[in-house]
């Protein structure tokens, strides 16, 4: 029992360290991708090819003074970024990275293989809103509060879209366990993946909105709200918001890879691809989704707020509800 607890603790610490490093170099990759689309070089002065730029940025931010506005609520002001950062980490507890063989039995490589993994992730995503609202309210700034209100309405609206999208996957697989979903979905015929393409697209757009990423980064629209709900933050609290945003990007990409892209299985059932370890395939799929995040930021203009809400309530929600009926009918008549 003690060995099991210690092994899980080691897993958690290693995962947290790796995730923070991934966040650091995701910012580097983002700047390089955007620079390439604009025919610029990007960061290339600090270290070879600019590879030490994230470390320089981290040192610069951490050496800044922590400033708390006079009118702010100090405890809530400092608690809000901790909420966002911690919630970005705890979601990884149920993400399966692959499979490993123990006593001749294949078991998923995951910190906590719970049967309600999907519900757990939806619950964690719902709690993210509280960190944003607390940050905006505790700052006692009009810009912060308006950014927090925008973010809350945006995140809640798109959670309502994400839930029925995930419901279509649950109907297809008959399970809430993420590892079982990957295995069952892999056994389904290929035409099911084609049928699920609209849901895959809607899920991707929804996680863009859920993570407040471009073109839906309206809570931090520079021309209107300066920096949004985190405008009063500096130093370590600001860094926690920054880490939370990019860690949520990676978490959302891993969820998409698990539910829609086949998890740790190769994209095509060909013997040459099956030689590659499943963990590598899972990482490559996450990198692909993250690259889509970056390309979207580099190429698309920002949506207006009314366009964002109209897309959610008048386009995505009706389509997802229709798809639930379609998938439910296919399952009910044993076509899938």
Curated annotation (Swiss-Prot):
Subcellular location: Cell inner membrane
Transmembrane helix in keyword set: yes
GO molecular function terms listed in the Swiss-Prot or TrEMBL record: NADH dehydrogenase activity; oxidoreductase activity, acting on NAD(P)H, quinone or similar compound as acceptor; quinone binding
EC number, UniProt record: 7.1.1.-
A cellular component term, taken from the record's GO annotations: plasma membrane
Membrane topology: Multi-pass membrane protein
Family: Belongs to the complex I subunit 1 family.
HAMAP family for this protein: NDH1_NuoH (MF_01350)
Name the UniProt record assigns to this protein: NADH-quinone oxidoreductase subunit H
The species this protein was found in: Neorickettsia sennetsu (strain ATCC VR-367 / Miyayama) (Ehrlichia sennetsu)
């Amino acid at each position: 029992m003690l060995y099991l607890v210690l092994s899980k603790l080691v897993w958690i610490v290693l995962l947290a360290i790796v995730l923070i490093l991934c966040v650091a170099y995701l910012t580097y990759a983002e700047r390089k991708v955007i620079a390439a689309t604009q025919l610029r070089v990007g960061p290339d002065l600090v270290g070879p090819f600019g590879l030490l730029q994230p470390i320089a940025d981290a040192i610069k931010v951490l050496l800044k003074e922590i400033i708390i506005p006079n009118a702010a609520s100090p405890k809530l002001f400092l608690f809000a970024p901790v909420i966002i950062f911690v919630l970005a980490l705890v979601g990884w507890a149920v993400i399966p990275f692959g499979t490993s063989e123990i006593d001749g039995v294949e078991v998923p490589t995951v910190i906590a293989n719970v049967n309600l993994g999907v519900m757990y992730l939806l619950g964690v995503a719902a709690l993210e809103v509280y960190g944003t609202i607390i940050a905006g309210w505790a700052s006692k700034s009009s810009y912060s509060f308006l950014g927090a209100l925008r973010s809350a309405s945006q995140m809640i609206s798109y959670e309502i879209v994400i839930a029925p999208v995930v419901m279509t996957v649950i109907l297809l697989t008959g399970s809430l366990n993420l590892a079982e979903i990957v295995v069952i979905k892999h056994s389904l015929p290929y035409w099911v993946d084609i049928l699920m393409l609209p849901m895959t697209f809607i899920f991707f757009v929804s996680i863009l909105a859920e993570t407040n990423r471009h073109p839906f980064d309206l809570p931090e629209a520079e021309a209107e709200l300066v920096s949004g709900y985190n405008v009063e933050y500096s130093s370590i609290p600001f860094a926690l918001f920054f880490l939370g945003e990019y860690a949520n990007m990676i978490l959302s990409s891993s969820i998409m890879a698990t539910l829609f892209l086949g998890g740790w299985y190769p994209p095509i059932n060909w013997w040459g691809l099956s030689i590659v370890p499943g963990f590598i395939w899972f990482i490559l799929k996450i990198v692909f989704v993250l690259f889509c995040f970056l390309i979207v930021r580099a190429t698309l203009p920002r949506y207006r707020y009314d366009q964002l809400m109209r897309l959610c309530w008048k386009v995505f929600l009706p389509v997802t509800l229709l798809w639930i009926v379609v998938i439910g009918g296919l399952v009910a008549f044993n076509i899938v």
